[in-house]
Amino acid sequence: MTDLRTEELDFVIPDSCIATQPATPRDSARLMVVPLDGSAVQHRVVRDLPDILHHDDTLVLNHTRVLPARFHTKRHDSGGAVEGLFLQEVNGRWQCFLKAGGRLTPGLKLDWFDGQHLVLDEPAAEGWWVRPEPAGSPEGLLAAGGATPLPPYIRKARKDRAESFADATDRDWYQTVFGDGRAASVAAPTASLHLTPELVQQFNSLRVELEVGAGTFKPVATDRLADHPMHTERCHVPRATLKALPQATRRIAVGTTALRTLESLPSPLPTEDWSAETDLLIMPGHRFRWADGLLTNFHLARSTLLALVAAFTGIDRLRDLYDEAVQEGYRFHSYGDAMLLLPGDHA
């Protein structure tokens, strides 16, 4: 692995480049096609994928679904606002990030909706452990009382631009058209947001699931990337995918989450359904075993996602590509445009 200095992942993206809503229709998003042999970049749109990829290429898709994991409550004792983000459920307790103006203490009751409460149990390694009262599943309670977990930079950009969209609209925008897995992610596999049913039907595809956690947005705080404490996420690969994977001619991972799932697979490949937790950190120097190309969005500076893309391109070329994307007016981050990294024989 390359001993990458985190400062090499620094760059400045103008606020005007941050997308606050997706392209409509989904496949009208712009697409920067990057041959990995160093030849010239092409500027296309996502709906051109059938003309860009080989007819026998295989897309690897993350079928996870996004929970409406953000919620707004009030302290039962004072009425003060407490905002939360659901992370996971373990034995009836929820791990949540909580943001409040005052001090939070065990036993505090939060009023949520329609007589539903959350009671603080104890601090967690990150955030708090809370208990829903009455008890209920995260899927059911958050569907009724939660909101789309948009990244903070989108919410900030909307506020700065005085933009407002109904949560029902974001619930549609921030969900893939093909996702039929467990609703357990607190962020979308955003490269997949560009795909339409018509596009997906034109390719062979393989199914994986990775439950995207809040750690995906966590900036690298260490001086060396290798020292970053990588977040853990749950992933699942069904037997059918494991059987078909070695026979695929070129495997194009749609999104960093699909790619991390593939590269986390043990060797030799399991012969039955495989589930595990992965904390794989992919950086320059990584030797890819199961991904020949990658469809991805334009990522935040100082992020592990950016380091993953640099594992394909090298950090210097990636910085040049991002500079070109800014100059060409590409839209960045979760609701933004896409980049397609391909072997040089893609044409």
Model-derived regions: residue spans:
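Surface-exposed, charge/polar-rich loops and edge strands
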Residues: M1-A347
